[in-house]
Amino acid sequence: MVTSVACGGGNTIKKAVPGPTATVRSARAAHLTLSSTAFSDGAPIPKQYTCDGANQSPPLSWSAAPTGSASLSLVVEDPDVPGGGFVHWTVSGIAPSVIALQAGHAPPGATEGRNGAGSVGYTGPCPPAGQTHHYLFMLKAVAGSTVLAVGELTGTYQRPGP
């Protein structure tokens, strides 16, 4: 199923559709510490990482994945978009030995998925003018379909109002 949602600038875009596989979170999932040198948890995301700037993914780093992790996956989503949110970036197949992403890059060997705009790769925050939206960066360490650890980082962005 594909639904259409409005996202900034009056453009209509398609919302990403989740894949057919699901993951199960372990009852004892560990915590990954996910952070960025560009912004703190709960703070505004700098303009260069948005549609109003260079539209590149921010630098991210995290604590080591737990033993037994087969890979890491990252999803960036705006839950404030009406109709169920908007996916800005998905990256899967990140090697468990990787502990950081440089700005504007996915790690070698990882797979970037389609975002809510229908393109592959990152698309930066772009809420309607005058509205503040929240952007949830969620990193999961997985083994098969089991989630071993989760880390979250939230940023905000507001475009100037009319």
Regions found by a protein language model. Give the residues of each.
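N-terminus-centered regions that define maturation/targeting leaders and the start
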Residues: T3-P162
